[in-house]
Swiss-Prot record:
Source species of the chain: Cupriavidus necator (strain ATCC 17699 / DSM 428 / KCTC 22496 / NCIMB 10442 / H16 / Stanier 337) (Ralstonia eutropha)
Annotated function: Catalyzes the phosphorylation of ribose 1,5-bisphosphate to 5-phospho-D-ribosyl alpha-1-diphosphate (PRPP).
Pathway recorded for this protein: Metabolic intermediate biosynthesis; 5-phospho-alpha-D-ribose 1-diphosphate biosynthesis; 5-phospho-alpha-D-ribose 1-diphosphate from D-ribose 5-phosphate (route II): step 3/3
A Pfam family recorded for this sequence: Glycos_transf_3
One of the record's GO molecular function terms: ribose 1,5-bisphosphate phosphokinase activity
ATP-binding keyword on record: yes
Keywords: Alkylphosphonate uptake, ATP-binding, Glycosyltransferase, Multifunctional enzyme, Nucleotide-binding, Transferase
Top-level enzyme category: transferase
InterPro entries: Glycosyl_Trfase_fam3, Nuc_phospho_transferase, P-loop_NTPase, PhnN, PYNP-like_C_sf, PYNP_C, Pyrmidine_PPase_CS, Thym_Pase_Put
Presence of the UniProt keyword NADP in the record: no
Family (UniProt): In the N-terminal section; belongs to the ribose 1,5-bisphosphokinase family. In the C-terminal section; belongs to the thymidine/pyrimidine-nucleoside phosphorylase family. Type 2 subfamily.
Protein name, per record: Bifunctional ribose 1,5-bisphosphokinase-thymidine phosphorylase
GO cellular component: cytosol
Amino acid sequence: MKATGTFFFVVGPSGAGKDSLIDGARAALDGDYVFARRVITRPDGSAGEEHEGVTEAEFARRQRSGEFLVTWDAHDLRYGLPKSLMCELERGRNVVANGSRGVIAELAARLPRFVVVLVTAPHDVLARRIAARGRESGDQVASRVARAGAPVPPHVPCITVSNHSTLEAGTARFVEALRTGTRTSAAERPASRTNLMAKLRGEPLDEAAYVAVLQDAIAGRYTEAELTEFLVAATRTLTDEEVVALARARTAFTPRIDWDEPVVVDKHSMGGVPGSRITLIVVPIVAAYGLAMPKTSSRAITSAAGTADAMETIARVDLAHEDVRRCVAQARACIAWNGRLNHSVVDDVMNAITRPLRLDSRRWSVASILSKKYTAGATHVIVDLPYGPQTKLATRADAEALGALFEHVGKGLGLHVRALVTDGSGPIGRGIGPALEVRDVRLVLDNAPDAPADLRDKALRFAGEIIAFDPRVDSPEHGMQIAAALLHEGKARAAFDRIAAAQGVRCDPVAPGTHTLVVPATTRGRVAGVDGLQISGVARAAGAPRDGGAGVDMLCAIGAKVAPGQPLYRIHSDSAEALEAAAALVRAGGECCQAVRIDPD
């Protein structure tokens, strides 16, 4: 009898939460869905999923007698799905099974209605979940997260589900994917295929064409191979007007928030600069001035801290939409994690492809960034474009070109966008790591004599540009004067405290780690530069951003003369073990590979 049910094969990286979503779907779906119970060579009752535990000998016997639909090996265990699942398919029931990417091709060749469900989450979310298990070091967690899974074979239908926020939200998306997959697994080729093929030939697409392609991609009507070809073509031939069309198309998938205010401001940075925690200074200055600034920010992926990681050392950041509205009403601003707020179903699908392939998706990202700013209700956006050897933008020319594109696309969306090119050649501020960066922020807000001047100056520049969005302010220079006065008079610090209180102040603010090690100069000379990638690597080895108190405190300035034994930077950690891991990384660097470069006088 021909199988009529759909077989859903669930795959995804460690930390994505596949088992939790499957459990949630089991409770939500009716009897038309059967959830496979895997046979595993480990005892019944072991930690993890409910399974049938068997011995190695019993597993081998069943395999010889043909009792398995498919088998695979992983983590020194053997896994099998029983052949009896075929009977469920023949009865018209849909089967949901958790499995390995390595057997997708084998199953797809045997099952006429077969859909892969790829569960994903941003790298920072995966890292936090894996780290919470307490079984791996910071470097091991980073290595596991960076590991790219095998691609889904060509022509196999694949639906991507992002499980990045709450279990309830992830389960709802997972259940909808199963329902969508049931409807589309045997459907005809998508109507938007002519648009996709046109892009593969290098032809431009308009807004309607992008909407059609994205709708079919979200519904799982394209294979991963087809979407990969599409994205590769788009990174090569995406014109400026197409970026506008793509940005406008993306806004069709998320309703826009209405703040009922003439000016709602936001900020975005392309990142890549250690420290540089200006958002925690800019937002309270702007709030003190009176403009609404509901700022959502990311956690760190490969750096030592993200804005959300830093803010979380003093206040709650996992805000829901109603929390953001309340904070803006009470304090005129918030600094929240974007994981619960700026979800994009389009990014769920596309990021799962672009990240492992390391595609140059900067132009695509402009559409993504600005479409999310638009749907979040912003009217005016400022963009920080740092350039330097270890940032996403290698040269000033690269940054200027991308800045022009940001402003052009913003205009196409009806947004006022101002892009600023900044120096990203080295760290800004002294602290690198969540609590250390917040210490620098507090020094600036408190007008302390030892506040990092570079951090203060950059924050005032951006705050001035934002304040100048107000039609009553005639220039960015005037805006910067207003910003400096708000900072000097303590109004920015008061606004910062109001924002933290509205979000929920931590009763135990995270302090810099008490396990410390000073790294001294080994030669005489002048500090010529700081390698941002290496210094962030040391901070991560010490535990940042997972441990909020971990990081690096810079004790020398560019251009300063140093002698052997003079402190260059201090490593902070929350444990002796993590401190030793960071120290070992420093020792392994040797003279030719140091975070602080010293040139002879």
